Curated annotation (Swiss-Prot):
Protein name listed in UniProt: Vacuolar membrane protease
Residue numbers marked as site, Transition state stabilizer: 318
Catalytic machinery residues: 221
GO biological process, one term: proteolysis
Bias-annotated ranges (Acidic residues): 562-579
Names of the cofactor(s): Zn(2+)
Locations listed in the record: Vacuole membrane
Top-level taxonomy: Eukaryota, Fungi, Dikarya, Ascomycota, Saccharomycotina
Organism whose genome encodes this protein: Candida tropicalis (strain ATCC MYA-3404 / T1) (Yeast)
Domain of life: Eukaryota
SUPFAM superfamilies per the UniProt record, alphabetical: Zn-dependent exopeptidases (SSF53187)
Sugar-bearing residue positions: 143, 162, 354, 627, 752, 764
Residue sites binding Zn(2+) 1 per the record: 176, 188, 247
GO molecular function: metal ion binding; metalloexopeptidase activity
Length: 908
C-alpha cells in the first residue's frame, strides 16, 4: 500500500512536497480516540484549565497535609491498653494537683508541690529495692553569667533506678516543678513533671532496666536554671552521660523535639511512637531567636548528650494565668508521656555507647509520625555532590540543546523571570511594610496566615501580570523550561551558602534547619535535566529545501488534540504562513507538540506538590513558633514581617514556570482573595480572647509598672481601672529600648493589705589590707526567698552560715570555695557586679560579705549596694484589679521574679 492510500477509517488526504521532489500524502483527520484517551489528554495536556486544576489541587493537598501532620487530635491516639490508660489517668491527676495554684520558687504553694511530689515518689517506689530516693537540700554559689554570681538553696527531688549493668553510663530524665508567679504552670512545666512521674511508675512496675535511670524533679528553673545547676554538683551526676529534658515554652499542643546535642543521640528519637520534630527550631534556639532557655543548656554545657522535648506554642498565654488545666488537652500530656516512656525504654535497655555521631550536629524532621535524621557531615556530602553534578550534567545538555538543536533563547527568555522576581520582591516589601504593617502593626500575633496568604495572592498576581506582559511584548520560546533552569540556579546558589554554613556550624551561627534547600534544589534540578534531555533527543526537521530547522518553539507547548477551551488557544507567531507550509511539517510538529504538551505534567508533579509542601510546612512552623514574639520586641517584629515576605515569595517559586498559564477564573479568584484579605487586614483587631495581648506586671516600691509594646494602648487599658479613675492618679509611660514602654501609676493599697518589708544593715566593715576593703550586710525580707544585689568593683563575695569574719583576701582561692565553718566564697578578680540570692527559709536573714577595690580617686572607700527583694504570693490589690477589670483579650505575666518588690540602698 502506498503512502497515499487509505489504511483504515476515513481520512482526508493532502499532498506534501518531499525534499526529493516527490509527493506523499499526509492525513489531517484521524479516527477519534476513545473517551479514556480524550480524558487523559484533557487532564494532562498543557492547557490553562488543566494547569489551574493542578495548582488548586496542590494548594489543597499542601494545606490539608500540613494541617493533618501538625494536628494533635489527628496524629496522637490515646492509649488503649489498661496499663497505659492507668498511667495517663494517674499522670493527669498529678497534673491537676501540681497546677492547683501558681507555685513559683518564691511562693508557699511551691512547698506544697514539693511535698506532694515527695509523697507520690515515695508511694511509687515503695517496695522496689533497686530504686533510691534522695530528697536532701543543697547549697551552691557559682558564676551564672558574666560578672554575675548566684547563690541558691535548692530542694530537688532525685530518684535513681539502678540498672542491672553498672558499667553502663546512666540516663537522666529532668523537668522542673516551679512555675512563674503569674501562671499555674500546667505546660511549663507541670506536664513535664507529670510525665516524669508516669515514666517512674512505668519503670517501677516493669523489669529492672539494664541501664541506670536517674530522675531530677528540680526547682527554681524559671529565673536562672538553678535546680539543674545544683544537680550538676550532686554525686549522682558523675555517672550520667545521656539525658532527656522535658519542658514547656508554650502552652499545650504537640511536644516537639526542640534540639539535640548530637546526631548520635538524636537518631534514636525514631524509637518513639509519635515523633514530632524539626531542626528548624534547633536553629532558632541556637541562633538566639527564642529569648528563653531550658535546663538543656546546663546539661549540655556539663558534657552530657541528650534531647530537649518541649511544647512551643502559643506564647501569648505562656507564663500567664491562661496556662491552666481548662486550656489543655489530655492528648498533649499523653504525647509527651508516651514519647518519654518509649525513649527511656530504648535508651535504658540498649547499648548505644559506641554509637558514632557524638560530635556531629544533627539535622532532623518528622512526617506523619515517621522520624528522619542525618548528620551535618552526611548532608554536607550530599549537598556538595549535588552542587558539582548540576553544572556537570546540565552544562553539556544546555550546550547541545542551544548549539545543535537550535533552541533559540532570546532576551525575553533570559531576563523575564529575574526581572519579575526583583520587581515582585519590591512590591511585596512595599505592600507588607508600608501597607499591612502601618495599617495593623500587631496583626501577626493573631492572624499571621491571613497576612501570608494575602501577600502570596498579591505577589502571584504581580508575577502573572509581569510574565504575561513581557511575553506579550516580546514572545519567547519554551519559557517554562527556561524558568525551571533559572530557579534551579537560584536554589544552587542558596545551597552553596547553606553548605558553607553547615561546614562551619556553631552555636550562634547554626544552619541545621536549612535542610529544605537540599530537597528543593534536587526536585527543581531534576525537572530541569528532564526538560533538557527531552530537547537533546529530539529529531531535526527537514524543510522542503533539505535544510535543517528547529523542531520546537515556544508555541508548540499548547495542547493540540482539538479539546482546547477558549482560554487555551494561543496565536501562532507567523499568521501569514501559508496553508501548504503548515501541512509540510504537520506530522513532525504534531509528534513534538504532543511530547512537549504532556511533559509539563511530569515536571509539575515532580516539582510543585512536594516543594509546595516543604516550603509551606517549614514556613508555617516558623510563623507558628515566633508570631507571638511580636509582643516582645521591635527586633522580633522586624523578623516576623521579613519571614512573611520570604514565606510568600518561596511558596510561589515552584509554580513560577507555569504561572503564565493560569486561566482567567484562577486570576479572578486571586483578585477576589487579595481584596478580601486586604479588607480583613484593615479591619480586624490584632488581639482577641484566643490570641490575647500579653502585658507584664510588677509593683515596685508601691508603684505599679506595666510593660508591653509601644502602641498597643497600655495607657488606655490602665486608665479604665476603677482605682485609677477614683483616685485621679496619673499614668506615666516611659519609652524603653526595642519598641517597648513602661507605664506606671501609684498602686491602690486598701487598709487590710499585707505590706512587705525590707531592711538592710551594715554589720561589719574593716580595711583588710592597704589595697582591699571588706564589709558585710544583713538583709531581712520576711516571706521573701529571692533578692538581687547590684554593686561595682567587688572582687569576692561571701555567704555566711556562721560567724561573720574577714578572711585574708589572698587566702581565698579563685572561683568557688567553702571553709570549715560552712561559709561559701566566690572570688573573681576581674570583677563581680551582681549577686542573685535564693533561699528556702521564709524568715531567714541573708548575711553577705564583700571584698572590693576602691578607685584611687574615691574620697570615701565605701561600697554602694542596691538591694531588691521579691514576693510572689502576697495579696496584691493592683494586680488583682488588673486581672478582674481588663478586657478578655488581655493576659498578664510577671515582669520579674515576683509580682511585688521593694528596694533599698546602703553603703558599706
Amino acid at each position: 500500500m502506498t503512502s497515499g492510500e487509505e489504511e483504515e477509517g476515513t481520512r482526508e488526504q493532502v499532498p506534501v512536497s518531499q525534499p526529493t521532489g516527490t509527493t506523499s500524502i499526509v492525513s489531517t483527520k484521524e479516527k477519534q480516540p476513545n473517551i479514556f484517551i480524550r480524558a487523559i489528554r484533557a487532564t494532562f495536556g498543557y492547557r490553562k484549565t488543566s494547569l489551574t486544576l493542578f495548582v488548586l489541587l496542590t494548594i489543597f493537598f499542601t494545606v490539608a497535609f500540613s494541617s493533618y501532620d501538625n494536628s494533635l487530635d489527628f496524629t496522637i491516639d490515646l492509649p488503649e491498653t489498661k496499663f497505659e490508660k492507668q498511667l495517663l489517668d494517674s499522670s493527669w491527676l498529678d497534673l491537676q494537683n501540681i497546677a492547683r495554684y501558681p507555685h513559683s520558687y518564691g511562693s508557699h504553694a511551691n512547698d506544697k508541690v514539693h511535698d506532694y511530689l515527695e509523697s507520690r515518689i515515695s508511694q511509687t517506689i515503695k517496695g522496689k529495692p533497686f530504686i533510691e530516693f534522695d530528697n536532701g537540700d543543697e547549697k551552691i554559689l557559682y558564676n551564672s553569667s558574666k560578672k554575675v554570681v548566684s547563690y541558691y538553696e535548692g530542694n530537688n527531688l532525685l530518684v535513681r533506678v539502678n540498672g542491672t549493668d553498672s558499667s553502663l553510663p546512666a540516663f537522666l530524665l529532668s523537668a522542673h516543678y516551679d512555675s512563674v508567679p503569674s501562671s499555674y504552670g500546667v505546660t511549663d512545666d507541670g506536664m513535664g513533671i507529670a510525665s516524669l512521674l508516669g515514666v517512674l511508675s512505668y519503670l517501677a512496675n516493669n523489669k529492672q532496666p539494664k541501664r541506670t535511670v536517674i530522675f531530677n524533679f528540680n526547682n527554681d528553673e524559671e529565673f536562672g536554671l538553678y535546680g539543674a545547676q545544683a544537680f550538676v554538683t550532686h554525686p549522682w551526676f558523675k555517672q550520667i552521660q545521656y539525658f532527656l529534658n522535658l519542658e514547656g515554652t508554650g502552652a499545650g499542643g504537640k511536644a516537639i523535639l526542640f534540639r539535640g546535642t548530637d546526631y548520635g543521640i538524636v537518631k534514636h528519637f525514631d524509637k518513639v511512637r509519635y515523633p514530632y520534630a524539626t531542626s528548624i527550631f534547633q536553629q532558632g534556639f541556637n541562633n538566639r531567636l527564642i529569648h528563653s532557655e531550658t535546663d538543656y543548656k546546663v546539661y549540655k554545657e556539663a558534657g552530657l548528650r541528650g534531647l530537649d522535648l518541649a511544647f512551643y506554642k502559643p506564647r501569648d498565654i505562656y507564663h500567664t494565668g491562661e496556662d491552666n488545666i481548662k486550656n489543655i488537652n489530655i492528648r498533649s500530656l499523653w504525647h509527651m508521656l508516651s514519647n518519654s516512656i518509649d525513649f527511656t525504654n530504648f535508651i535504658s535497655n540498649s547499648i548505644i555507647d559506641n554509637d558514632t555521631g557524638k560530635d556531629e550536629p544533627a539535622i532532623y524532621l518528622s512526617v506523619l509520625n515517621y522520624f528522619f535524621s542525618t548528620s551535618v557531615t552526611t548532608l554536607n556530602t550530599i549537598n556538595m555532590v549535588l552542587i558539582v553534578l548540576f553544572p556537570v550534567l546540565s552544562g553539556p545538555l544546555l550546550f547541545i540543546t542551544v548549539r545543535y538543536k537550535k533552541w533559540n533563547i532570546g532576551t525575553a527568555n533570559l531576563f523575564s523571570l529575574p526581572l519579575a522576581i526583583v520587581i515582585t520582591s519590591l512590591v511585596g516589601a512595599v505592600v507588607v511594610n508600608q501597607g499591612f504593617r502601618l495599617v495593623n502593626e500587631f496583626l501577626p500575633a493573631s492572624r499571621p496566615m491571613l497576612l501570608v496568604t494575602t501577600t502570596t495572592s498579591i505577589l502571584l498576581l504581580t508575577y502573572y501580570i509581569l510574565l504575561n506582559g513581557i511575553n506579550f511584548v516580546s514572545p519567547s520560546g519554551d519559557q517554562k523550561l527556561v524558568s525551571i533552569i533559572q530557579i534551579s540556579f537560584i536554589y544552587w546558589i542558596a545551597l552553596i551558602f547553606v553548605t558553607r554554613g553547615l561546614s562551619q556550624n556553631a552555636i550562634g551561627d547554626d544552619h541545621t534547619g536549612e535542610f529544605a534547600f537540599t530537597i528543593l534544589f534536587l526536585l527543581e534540578a531534576t525537572a530541569s535535566l528532564f526538560g533538557l534531555i527531552g530537547w537533546t533527543f529530539t529529531r531535526s526537521v527537514k524543510e522542503p529545501t533539505g535544510d535543517e530547522e528547529p523542531l520546537l518553539n515556544g508555541r508548540m507547548e499548547r495542547y493540540v488534540d482539538g479539546s482546547d477551551d477558549e482560554d487555551d488557544v494561543e496565536e501562532e507567531d507567523d499568521e501569514d504562513q501559508s496553508e501548504e507550509e503548515n501541512h509540510q511539517h504537520e506530522m513532525t510538529v504534531k509528534h513534538l507538540m504532543q511530547h512537549f504538551g504532556y511533559d509539563w505534567s511530569l515536571q509539575f508533579l515532580l516539582i510543585v506538590p512536594i516543594s509546595s509542601l516543604v516550603i509551606y510546612n517549614s514556613g508555617w512552623l516558623v510563623i507558628d513558633g515566633i508570631n507571638k514574639s511580636i509582643q516582645e520586641s521591635l527586633v522580633a517584629e522586624n523578623f516576623i514581617y521579613l519571614i512573611i515576605q520570604l514565606f510568600s515569595q518561596f511558596w510561589i517559586l515552584p509554580i513560577l514556570p507555569f504561572v503564565y498559564k493560569l486561566n482567567r477564573f484562577m486570576v479572578l479568584g486571586l483578585i477576589a482573595f487579595a481584596l478580601v484579605g486586604v479588607t480583613l487586614i484593615s479591619s480586624v483587631d490584632p488581639f482577641n480572647q484566643d490570641n490575647p495581648l500579653k502585658l507584664r506586671f510588677i509593683e515596685r516600691d508601691g508603684v505599679a509598672h506595666v510593660y508591653g509594646r509601644t502602641g498597643v494602648g497600655i495607657s488606655n487599658i490602665l486608665g479604665d481601672m476603677p482605682s485609677v479613675k477614683e483616685s485621679g492618679v496619673g499614668i506615666k509611660c516611659d519609652s524603653l529600648p526595642d519598641g517597648n514602654e513602661d507605664c506606671s501609676y501609684k498602686a491602690y493599697l486598701p487598709g487590710n493589705s499585707t505590706i512587705p518589708s525590707l531592711s538592710v544593715k551594715s554589720i561589719n566593715s574593716t580595711a583588710q589590707q592597704a589595697y582591699i576593703n571588706f564589709g558585710a550586710i544583713q538583709i531581712n525580707a520576711p516571706e521573701s526567698r529571692e533578692c538581687s544585689l547590684e554593686f561595682k568593683k567587688v572582687k569576692a563575695i561571701v555567704v555566711y552560715s556562721g560567724e561573720i569574719t574577714a578572711k585574708n583576701f589572698k587566702a581565698i582561692p579563685d572561683g568557688f570555695s567553702e571553709d570549715s565553718k560552712g561559709n561559701l566564697y566566690y572570688k573573681d578578680v576581674s570583677g563581680i557586679d551582681v549577686a542573685q540570692l535564693n533561699k528556702l527559709g521564709w524568715n531567714k536573714k541573708f548575711n553577705f560579705g564583700f571584698y572590693w577595690l576602691p578607685d584611687i580617686d574615691d574620697d570615701v572607700a565605701a561600697l554602694p549596694i542596691h538591694v531588691e527583694c521579691f514576693w510572689s504570693d502576697i495579696t496584691i490589690p493592683a494586680y488583682d484589679e488588673l486581672l478582674h477589670y481588663t478586657p478578655n483579650w488581655v493576659t498578664w505575666a510577671n515582669r520579674e521574679k515576683g509580682l511585688v518588690s521593694l528596694t533599698n540602698r546602703i553603703e558599706v
